[in-house]
């Protein structure tokens, strides 16, 4: 169980916390991840979440670029300027901060979406629309969606 798979919707509690699904917490535990790196996704209205290796991957891409290039500067603005570290509380919950809410439109519920080596936080309706659009896009290109 070393991949983030499926999707789960959980309600935000009165204190602004949401429980990370147990299957996702198990992947984090297996990987020894204690601190989560979160950033505003480059394409979708979602927050991408993973361990330190997620940030490392982007920093390796930036290191391969000329540090003064537009590509490196744009990546840094997105990865560093659009990123934060968060920790889960002892019960496996995370705070749904303004950083998360403002970018995603999340209000009462969070859909956790597995993306293989990381997961994302979505507004449930936005995720349903994006998934439907992805299926339709694959259909239009003659690709199977299932």
UniProtKB/Swiss-Prot annotation:
Highest taxon listed in the record's lineage: Bacteria
Location(s), subcellular: Cytoplasm, Nucleoid
KW Repeat (keyword) present: yes
Domain (SpoVT-AbrB) ranges: 7-54, 83-126
Record's GO cellular component terms: cytoplasm; nucleoid
Subunit structure: Forms oligomers.
Recorded family membership: Belongs to the MraZ family.
HAMAP family: MraZ (MF_01008)
Protein name: Transcriptional regulator MraZ
Taxonomic source organism: Rhizobium meliloti (strain 1021)
Phylogenetic lineage: Bacteria, Pseudomonadati, Pseudomonadota, Alphaproteobacteria, Hyphomicrobiales
